[in-house]
Regions:
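Glycine-rich, charge-decorated loop segments at or immediately adjacent to ligand/cofactor-binding or catalytic sites
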Residues: 42-47, 139-149
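Short glycine-rich anion-binding loops that position phosphate/pyrophosphate groups of nucleotides
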Residues: 9-12, 65-67, 107-110
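A charged, well-structured terminal subsegment
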Residues: 94-97, 101, 153-175
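Short, acidic/small-residue loops that bind anionic groups at enzyme active sites
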Residues: 63-65, 105, 119-143, 155-158
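Glycine-rich beta-alpha loop segments
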Residues: 1-60
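Acidic/glycine-enriched connector segments
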Residues: 43-104
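Active-site/ligand-binding-proximal alpha/beta "capping" segment
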Residues: 89-126, 133
């Protein structure tokens, strides 16, 4: 089964538009036959896990002591397979290396770091290039600003797509 790593904010809550969109994305991913892998905690991570679980999908949570112990967090209730790392950087590398594709849902600096790290690893050949889509207007603005700047060197073009709906996510992962 192919695994899609999903990045996103821990801040969104049930009822928030981004949380509900994430539930739909998780459901669509599971219905398309993908396992989902997230950072294992709350917000987008929980919403993706919930949607995938409700659709009968396999949910992998990759947690880290560095976050869990600092903020006294437990993994979300939808995880079927739990992977634990001590350091955040090891968690991210695992999530990048084990994935067959990536989705970045709305998020902040942590999600931006995950996008940048994954994008750069694909560009330099540190991991195999896989489909990678960023969801929503925030990432569309950020990605287009980077792509239009003189600071982005060669090799970045065409690696990321922008999705505006859960259906777009599936379409962009299968092209």
């Amino acid at each position: 089964m192919k695994i899609i790593t999903v990045y996103g904010s821990s801040k969104v809550r049930p009822g928030d538009a981004d949380y509900e969109a994430s539930v739909k994305v998780g459901r669509k991913l599971a219905e398309a036959g993908y396992a989902v892998m997230t950072g294992g905690y709350y917000g987008v991570m929980e919403a993706i896990s919930k949607g995938a679980d409700e659709a009968g999908g396999h949910v992998i949570g990759v947690i880290t002591d560095q976050i869990g112990k600092r903020y006294n967090l437990e993994p979300n209730a939808y995880i079927k397979e739990l992977v634990n790392y001590t350091e955040l950087r090891d968690r991210l590398l695992y999530m990048v290396q084990k994935a067959d594709g990536y989705v970045a849902m709305p998020g902040g600096v942590g999600t931006l770091h995950e996008i940048a790290e994954t994008w750069e690893l694909m560009r330099i050949g540190g991991v195999q290039t896989q489909p990678f889509t960023c969801y929503g207007p925030l990432w569309e603005t950020v990605i287009h600003a980077l792509q239009g700047s003189p600071y982005l060197g060669e090799g970045y073009e065409g690696m990321l797509t922008i999705s505006h709906s859960p259906d777009d996510v599936i379409e962009n992962l299968t092209v």
